[in-house]
Curated annotation (Swiss-Prot):
Name the record gives this protein: Glutamine-dependent NAD(+) synthetase
Lineage top rank: taxon: Bacteria
Enzyme Commission designation: 6.3.5.1
Functional note: Catalyzes the ATP-dependent amidation of deamido-NAD to form NAD. Uses L-glutamine as a nitrogen source.
Underlying gene: nadE
Annotated residues for binding of ATP: G292, L293, S294, G295, G296, I297, D298, S299, T399
Species whose genome carries this gene: Xylella fastidiosa (strain Temecula1 / ATCC 700964)
Amino acid sequence: MSEFLRIAMAQFDFPVGAVAQNAERIIALIEQARDEHGADVVMFPELALSGYPPEDLLLRPGFLAHCQVAIERIAAATHGIVAVVGWPQSAGSVVYNVASVLCDGQVEQTYRKRELPNYAVFDERRYFEVDPNGSRCVFKVKGVPVGVLICEDLWFSEPLADTVCGGAELVLVPNASPYERGKHAQRDALLAERARETGAAIAYLNVVGGQDALVFDGASVVVDGHGRVHPAAAAFSDQWLVVDYMRSERRFVPLQWVVESEVSINALVWRAVVRGVQDYCRKNGFSKVWVGLSGGIDSALVLAIAVDALGADQVTAVRLPSRYTAELSNDLAAEQCHSLGVRLETVAIEPVFEGLLAALGPLFAGMAPDATEENLQSRSRGVILMALANKFGGLLLTTGNKSEYAVGYATIYGDMCGGYAPLKDIYKSQVFELAQWRNRVSDVLAIPPGVIHRPPSAELRAQQTDQDSLPPYEVLDGILSLYVDQEQSREDIIAAGYAAGVVDYVLNLVRINEWKRHQAAPGPKVSQRAFGRERRYPISNAYRG
């Protein structure tokens, strides 16, 4: 019986749908774990073969058949090491979320996930079934009894307890758990509790990378049999974790182990958004991006994110001044581009705007200017930016934040134009926090202080500020956090100290702008309740409450 078991944990990105490429990479990583790291066991994240979440690809028989062929090929290439690989298994008319144990050229065992999440961003019950006969997977490597669970299984006490009853003392848990604020602390507390309940040691491996609106943070850990959580991998980093499990003490000794000092929430959110932009571009064939730069804080923050994600040479900023654009706005945009080394172009919207006014003039005769003319300016900018991306290639990043998406303070087919929205899940007050944080952590000034300290304005009419139409952002975001993120009622929000008239005004804006959000570009989820797949409200909705 061996004193230790060496485990290689593959915290890498496995793109959705790239079955053949993922299979090739898994085989290469298995060989690397065996030959370079001397591992006895190598584990891969949940559904690593298909990527997570594959969504309705799982309804395509050809996709599932491709996965079956690929897992057999991986098994045939696995020798001198045990590999645990996640994939979607088709069995007749049903599909299971599984992790297979591969050894000596074949599939030795297959564990089927017991707990299928069907809340927030997860809808696994749409695709997967639970094995009616139950599922338990325990195997021995060098005399050590090892169990397997998958992600959500660990959030319930019974699956781990049952696996330990089956003889496991070390449990491997592949995951695909997306990032959100505060999740690390919640997860670590849960892992510690499960280990203390059972005395089992846990190797918790999470996938890393952006997938549309989801960003998986990795941040994998190991937990000893006494419930001590050992951070093992940097968040949002592609890397190996190699540890020796010391059986006599039920603890882990690091071989390849990255320990980070405590990371702030702002730092994690920044990494999530940067990784979201980076991977969305890479996985959809974009090497460069465009940003409409107004001299305001939202577009300035998006520009800094884009530079961190892709590099300054892959980012082009565009000023689009109008008759209402302050000279300070133009100057601040130029200052930021100079500081970051970003190419800056300028296209005045006045000719386009004037042309639209002239074309519509006969129909608008005798009517006072209103939001229509303001929106024409925004749509003029959208047309120009989309034309530049269309002509020269690249992805247009839209610059709206969560506060604006919530209350509709954005122009559909105007400033909402673009393919990805980096700030979609970040409230305006958090935009200011992130801008100040980004400036503190770099010698290069990312966002000019003048941008941060000036009153926010859309500059669509003379002397305009956001607070002409909206409550102060600290009030607005407080109400939105309660209503959107926490699903609190009007009465609860008023009881929290907000004026009834302001609450009614804000809640009505949220309700009547659902149609805009349904047409918004995707953006990285960083909160517990993001707009998109986890907040599915009807557009036609008579409920008030």
